[in-house]
Amino acid sequence: MVLSNVKIFRLKSHRAFRIGPMIKAVAGNLLVKRFYQPKLERIPPASLLLKQKIRLAQNGSTTSTENPISFSQTMSEIFSVLQPSAPDLDEDKTSGLKRDHLLTERLNNGELGVIMNKFFNPSSTHNNQLIDTNILLQNFPKLSGNDLDLLDFAINEKMRGNWNDLKQDFIQLWYYKSFGFLGPRTQFVLTNSSPSLRSQFLKLPFTEYNWFLLQNNKNANILPADVQNVVKVFHLDDKRFTWKSIDPFSKAIISFVVFVSIYVWLDESAKQKTKDLPAQKSTVISE
């Protein structure tokens, strides 16, 4: 019996000696996983984030009936009863996220490059592959609504990054989409010139004219058919932002705000003085 007990004790101690390091290793791994979290350098793709937003929006719309009714939800239900034709905000949000997800997939699949090569064919004669002006003017109106939506989405997405990484043909198309033929220019027409209007614009095939460039030019001959294409661009100067040019209602609001600010400042200063007087009296009595 004594020998058997000794063997059992040795066997148990041997097992404990073998299990002890295993427990320490497992505990060490748990501590490492608990307190050490490696930083992932890989950023999740935009399409995955959009899918997550769509799923959260749909889950929020389905579980909103289970949550307690809030004040905003009650007001939205009241307005929906009063205005049945008003659009649903949740549906608009979900449809907008689905649209962004679809445009992201189209942009990642290289559809924008296919459109640019199909309609504009950037010339390889230039160093930075610029689009020929005549091709740009002729083929840009041929873009469909889906193509323009993809172009606008690409502009909004790529403008957030480094502009030095953008290609010149994309910048040229972005510029034309934003500003048109004339671009953000202020002085283009000579005031003392007598030739026809199109020659003053360097003989470029413009189809619309900037009204600001022509308002001081008395020698410019504009045909009646071209008047419909005139774009009115108002030039803002310092004279517009004067006290005399402000309407009476705005003056009254500004004066009221200034009066209230002065009244609050005087009231706070008076309260501060009344608080300081007892402190001064206590110091005098103590002396």
UniProtKB/Swiss-Prot annotation:
Transmembrane segments: 250-266
Membrane topology: Single-pass membrane protein
Compartment(s) of residence: Mitochondrion membrane
Main location as per UniProt: mitochondrion
GO cellular component term of the entry, any: mitochondrial membrane
Function (record text): Involved in respiratory growth and required for cell survival in the absence of prohibitins or GEM1.
Protein name per UniProt: Genetic interactor of prohibitin 7, mitochondrial
Native source organism of the sequence: Saccharomyces cerevisiae (strain JAY291)
Gene for this chain: GEP7
